[in-house]
Every structure is written in C-alpha cells, then in structure tokens.
Amino acid sequence: MDPLEDVLTLLKTRSHLSASLVAGGRWAVVFDAPQVLKFNAVRRGACLLKVDGDDEPIDLAEGDCYLLTRPRSFTLCSDLEAAPSDGGAVFARAEDGIARAGQGDDVFLIGGGFSFATHAQELLLDNLPPVVHVPAGTPHAEAVQWALTAIDQELTHQPMASTLVAEHLAVVMLIHVLRLHLERAPDAVSGWLAGLADPVVASALTFLHRDPAHSWTVAELASAAAVSRSTLAARFKATVGQGPLEYLTRWRIELTARQLREGSAPLAAIAHSVGYGSESALSVAFKRVLGMNPGDYRKHPMP
C-alpha cells in the first residue's frame, strides 16, 4: 500500500450520506459543528458557505464540493443577510431523502460525512486546512465530478443497493479530493500529507509504509530515494515535521495499536510483525508514544 491508502485503511474510513437539500429564493440553513469529516457538493445552482471562524464566505458554484475538516458550525445560504433556519429542524422534515429551504428549487446539494475508527483528527484531519474547497473548474477535477455524478444518480434513481454503492462512491470521491488538493495546494497541507507532495520525501514514505518491519536507516532510505543522507533528513524533517525514523516509530505504534484493538495475537508476535526485536522494546516505544503500555491499551483502547 502507499501511505495515503495505508492511513485511510487504518482509519477504517466510512461514509454516511445525509438527505439532499433543495433550496430557492432567499434562504439560509445553519448547522451545528459536525463531529465527522463533512462534505457537500452543489449539483445545481449556486450558494454561499460561511464557516464559523472564517471572515469571508466561500462562493459555491454548480459542480463545486468541499470538505470541513474541523468541528465548526457553518451556514449554507443564498446571501449573508437571509434569516437562518436550524439545520437539524430542516433535515428532520426531509421527505423522500430531500430537505427543503426557502421557496423554489434553484439549488440542489448532496452531502454527508466520513467517520473513522480511530484518532483521525491527529493522523489525517489536522494535516489538512479547515476547509478544502474544490471548484468545478479545477484542472484534473474530472474524477471528482465523475464520483459526484455517480452518487447523484444512485440517490436519484435508487436502484438495488443504491445506498451502499453511493457510500462507497463517496469514499472514492474523498480520495480524489485529497489527491487533487495535494496536487494543486501542497503548501496548504502539513505532516505526512505534505510529504506526499515532495517526490523525495514521498519515495521515503512509500518505502517505510511498504515494509515497516524492516530495520531502516536514514542512509538506506536516502539511497532508495536517490539522494544524499543529509538531503533526505533535512527535507523529511522540514516537510513532515519529524525525522524519517521518528515517523517510522510512530507508524509502527499505530500498526501495533490496530492489532491490539482488533486481534488477540500475543505481544511478542506483534512486536516481530512491526519490526521490534522483543516485546519489551515494543512496550517501551508504545508507552513513549501513546502514554500507556500495550496491555492496558488492549483492555481500554483509546478512540
């Protein structure tokens, strides 16, 4: 697996689609801070997105989509002066999967959220800006538009297993949005995600994820990436925020935590599978990173 696939798999990324929103005239719907990674896409018309904490609204045109990566309240509206309706109440009145606001049907949005099985905020979301906006006219956005169109068709025509198909398509859309954001705005991400935008760092990350149990050295990674040891160390630290071996330790602990949450393998076997020579060596590293020993974590795994 590559690093992005690895992390999304570790997080057990799942999508959940909400009712669609049809709106017209002057309207505004205010939403509480979402506890998931929220997304919406404008399939018809145009509107404004105003996120709590941001001074300026975002113009959403037909075909645009966005992700909200922080738990902030937000408003979708025709204009900033329109009287807002409570989103919970609006969607509680939804019929046949469609909520309505204002008068008419000038605007049509689909949306939902992504949930994760473990601490996604630290592993993924904190490395993204609070709002990821993908305009329809963005170069190379065809894959995002294809996924959104396919979701729209599943929700509109509702063939067999349409909800399941649409939710899987939403995960496909998320991956394409993340790829596109890395390509067009590499300076707007941080951590390992930023590393994927640097070919040298991305090469090292790929090797680390491909074989985390290997006894990697910085020199060996540098050779694999075809740069000097000092170049790799400096670029990795500057981009990811920690050195290659520090990153490897953290990733090994994440893999260990997953095995402790989901399986019953003895700690010695887990240690061997993630590159530690002994159970005690893994225990020391685990406690240093997560603040508790593996045995306690297995009994009381952290969210």
Swiss-Prot record:
A UniProt-annotated Pfam family: HTH_18
Annotated DNA-binding residue span(s): 219-240, 267-290
Stored InterPro entries: AraC_lig, AraC_XylS_family_regulators, Homeodomain-like_sf, HTH_AraC, HTH_AraC-typ_CS
Signal peptide coordinates: none
Domain called HTH araC/xylS-type: residue spans: 202-300
Keywords, in A-Z order: DNA-binding, Transcription, Transcription regulation
The protein's name in its UniProt record: Putative AraC-like transcription regulator
